[in-house]
């Protein structure tokens, strides 16, 4: 896999390694998860709080019972009404295989599903989660969720892959992973963040944030968000990052972005970041309007270093043919003033 070039080699390096599952691609494709460990069966949709008796057979019990390899499968289907957020940072080495659920599968409600938010290495920051999570719906809503919770997300960890996740109805972003290493989010839907909810900052219907080192974000549908559709996370200035904040090259490709708000930022960010943004499909919708955000590939910063090519903007042949001139350089924030041509050209990775 080579950054800065069209992707023709995904899967070629580490060719003797075993994929997390057939069809796994990108930076997290060799995650082992619970391979070789216990098979744990979810037999109840019940959940429990910290001050309550643990419920064997629940999803939470399977996650929190151990940090030894385990694969979680489902004998039940339906809605799990979480009594608090699910966190993986202290419970690594697991696979959650949602497609084993009968019927209509599994939906997580009420609270967030978070891989790691800690900045403390003692409880996960910078550590390997070694997690495979597939075929779940994460729709917390705002009846109980904290004012800043994502539907699914995490930061400052390494070694994980999520696949066929549907995320929505979140107070903050729907699907957000940044500062991560050896990570993939693939074949996911992230839609309908709640714009007017209980976020402390007010209107906050945001889509996703992406960044990392050897991290991949591909085949993701982002739809119906006020902003961050997606946000390429800004990084700290070189030499100032913390050890747990993984920064390097990451890959954003083959995604679909639909109906971002023309009053929000749409797709933006990337200060000090190095990344691919290739072959994505931008489809303005009823909320998008006709201002310059309707053909925005990315509103970025001259410090970004990116390979941007092959992105298609429905209804705008000019930006489709030339992503950079109006789709990126023409989208600079006015606070940057006039950006010299040399700084514009320096953004382009060959």
Where are these regions (language model features)?
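Right-handed parallel beta-helix
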Residues: 93, 97-98, 126-140, 156-169, ...
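Extracytoplasmic/secreted cell-surface and envelope-processing proteins
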Residues: 81-84, 142-147, 171, 239-240, ...
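Acidic Gly/Asp/Thr-rich repetitive segments characteristic of extracellular carbohydrate-active
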Residues: 19-72
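A mature extracytoplasmic/lumenal domain signature
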Residues: 44-46, 76-78, 100, 112, ...
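Extracellular beta-strand-rich solenoid/capping regions of secreted or surface-exposed proteins
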Residues: 55-67, 80-97, 106-134, 140-157, ...
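Structural detector of coil-to-beta-strand junctions
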Residues: 112-114, 122, 151, 174, ...
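Long, contiguous C-terminal flanking segments immediately downstream of a protein's structured core
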Residues: 3-28, 38, 78, 278, ...
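Acidic glycine-/aspartate-rich tracts in secreted/extracellular proteins
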Residues: 46-48, 70, 77-79, 100-103, ...
